[in-house]
Amino acid sequence: EGGVKVIDINTLGVLYVMNNTEKVTVSSFEDLRGKTVYCPAQNPTFLFKAVCEANGLKVGEDIVIDNTYAQPADLRTALASGMVDIAVLPEPMVTIAKSANASLSASIDLTKEWEKHYPENSLMQGCVVVRTQFLEQYPDTVKAFLNEYKASIEFVNANPTVQRRLDKFIGK
């Protein structure tokens, strides 16, 4: 039907509600009532809005979702510097923010909230796609890529020294 096909799902839920524990306490969605939560634009906002509403919070009335910092890296910086008190962030931004500011906490795991309210739908956050035409023309090449892709993931996971060197490139 479409021009691309998903050939691997590589990232499930990685989104968290984070808060500055010195300024605000957040342990449930009810704690977000009356608050402004900063959220990266697009998918994180759509997901967060759905989970807010599933938890009884009407966006625009009970809670404000602010997309001022549309990019996760910009929002991470704003949260870590204290310009923002509550934010939705993905990994690895969560870890980076926490390493910059010890007062930050990943207080709500949005994957767990999603699974609680939408158990029939997995929260996929990342995948590998291929153009359908390429897949049909070069199935052996795609299969070889997937085998190498899997082997590279297994190698990195089995070698913490390599992981640490790669972390420098992704900002951890």
Regions found by a protein language model. Give the residues of each.
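Short, glycine-/small- and polar/acidic-enriched structural segments
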Residues: 1-68, 85-91, 107
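Pocket-lining segment of extracytoplasmic ligand-binding domains
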Residues: 68-167
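Acidic/histidine-enriched active-site and ligand-binding environments that engage anionic O-linkages
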Residues: 168-172
